[in-house]
């Protein structure tokens, strides 16, 4: 696998990429962004997760919030909402702590579990970062959704891991090329925070910046 040590992309972009490659390109390479109710609610949920004590002990579980992670193999870096470390005989040592600990990443999301795998891919990428950093194996983690307010366990299967690797590689290829995929309108577009910038009804191959620049040049 290629080592992306000098070319790290935001891990959070993996979720955008899995949901819509054009959305990812608008947010990251083109740095376009718009807030809507969904993104505001999602941001509040993440802030609540990070606002609590960054380090907490509950019996035989150590809870870390806002933990920075990186994978040079995937070329991704980011922040985990919560990583639980459970005391385990086959875990890993942690600085300042006695015994061995098994990492268990938990990601907070608004709404309900989705029909696509975007959330699962982001969580799996976090686990793969932790595995690379701690030299350990993490078989599963959990997604906590805001509406049902309960956890959904995610198994990090070989298939899910391979999708993370493939999408990460494709993200780097598109980023290096500066390419923004053309719009492919779908029912998901109505809730997208970038629908006004993306202009999916035009189904253009050009980037948003190119379109806006051309529109300004053509205006009287």
PLM-predicted stretches and their roles:
Residues 17, 28, 163, 167, ...:
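Residues that form generic nucleotide/phosphate-binding pockets
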Residues 20, 179-220:
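Cysteine-cluster motifs in flexible loop/terminal segments that predominantly coordinate metals
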Residues 77-78, 84-177, 190-196:
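Nucleic-acid nuclease catalytic cores
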Residues 11, 22-23, 161, 168, ...:
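Alpha-helix initiation and N-capping motif
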